[in-house]
Design a protein with these regions (language model features):
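A beta-strand edge to alpha-helix "cap/lid" segment located at domain peripheries
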Residues: 1-36, 44-136
Length: 136
């Protein structure tokens, strides 16, 4: 089997997925600050439980404070991650499955748009939606 080709120096895939995983790890312990720390001041956020988009990190922080300490995820899977680079932006898409206590399972689709700013990547747009159940 041939050696794996190392990612190009300008390929943000590993860095962005690492940022996302670190934020998800904290989220699962009830700490939304991991996401706030990687969001740009002008981030926009869509959530299926909200009627409208949230504009700006300050507004997102106010919303996340209502959730602080209330999320408990025992483990999660970040499936099918794909990072597509477009200039100074990169789009991360993935499927997310979270497991709480017992057999509780929640399935999500996620799209995060990252922007390169000051040598680091920050989220400028985030969109979470429920994954439809598989029909048999």
């Amino acid at each position: 089997m041939p050696d794996a080709i190392p990612p190009a120096a300008d390929d943000p895939t590993e860095a962005i997925i690492a940022l996302e995983r670190a934020a998800l790890d904290r989220w699962g312990k009830g700490d939304p600050s991991g996401f706030l720390e990687i969001c740009a001041p002008d981030v926009v956020y869509f959530d299926p439980s909200l009627e409208r988009r949230i504009d700006g990190r300050d507004a997102l922080a106010r919303y996340y404070e209502t959730l602080r300490g209330k999320v408990s995820i025992q483990r999660y899977e970040l499936l099918n991650p794909l990072v597509q680079r477009v200039g100074a932006a990169a789009i991360l898409t993935f499927n997310h499955v979270s497991y709480g206590g017992g057999t509780a399972e929640h399935r999500w689709n996620c799209t995060e748009v990252y922007r390169r700013s000051g040598g680091s990547w920050e989220i400028i747009q985030t969109h979470w939606s429920h994954t439809l159940a598989v029909r048999v």
